Regions:
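Active-site-proximal, substrate-binding regions of enzyme catalytic domains
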Residues: 1-42, 58-60, 70, 83, ...
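Short glycine-centered helix-capping/turn motifs at secondary-structure transition points
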Residues: 76-77, 92, 108
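Short alpha-helix plus adjacent loop in nuclease-associated cores
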Residues: 63-74, 78
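Long, amphipathic alpha-helical surface segments
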Residues: 93-97
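Alpha-helix capping/helix-boundary segments
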Residues: 50-51
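Short beta-strand scaffold positions
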Residues: 45-46
Length: 110
């Protein structure tokens, strides 16, 4: 499947920074964080707790998958977050009842 035209694939310039991050987090997250440090005003989508903590320490803006879904609802792109939360729960993605309730409140569905 081909990617939409608005998707741009970038490579990290500073591979040493990425390798240092790989000592603490997975390659995907380390690559994303290293690239965010090279692209001003970027916002990462991170769900991994450790990666989010590192991004926060480095001053990188981030959100999670659920945050993207909430934003899509609030911007009128999707009518409801509930079906997406249900799909997420069918995967190995862990979402607590507390986080789900918070998401529903933020999306004005509770």
């Amino acid at each position: 499947e081909t990617l939409p035209d608005w998707v741009i694939i970038e490579n990290v310039s500073d591979k040493s920074r990425q390798r240092i991050l790989e000592l603490q987090i997975d390659r995907g997250e380390s690559s994303a964080i290293a690239l965010a440090l090279e692209i001003p005003k970027s916002t990462l989508i991170l769900d991994d707790f450790k990666a989010r903590k590192i991004a926060q320490q480095l001053g990188i803006s981030f959100t999670g998958t659920i945050g993207v879904i909430i934003k899509a609802k609030l911007n009128g792109i999707i009518p409801s977050i509930k079906p997406y939360l249900e799909k997420i729960k069918e995967t190995n993605f862990r979402i607590s009842a507390e986080i789900e309730l918070q998401a529903l409140k933020e999306a004005k569905e509770y």
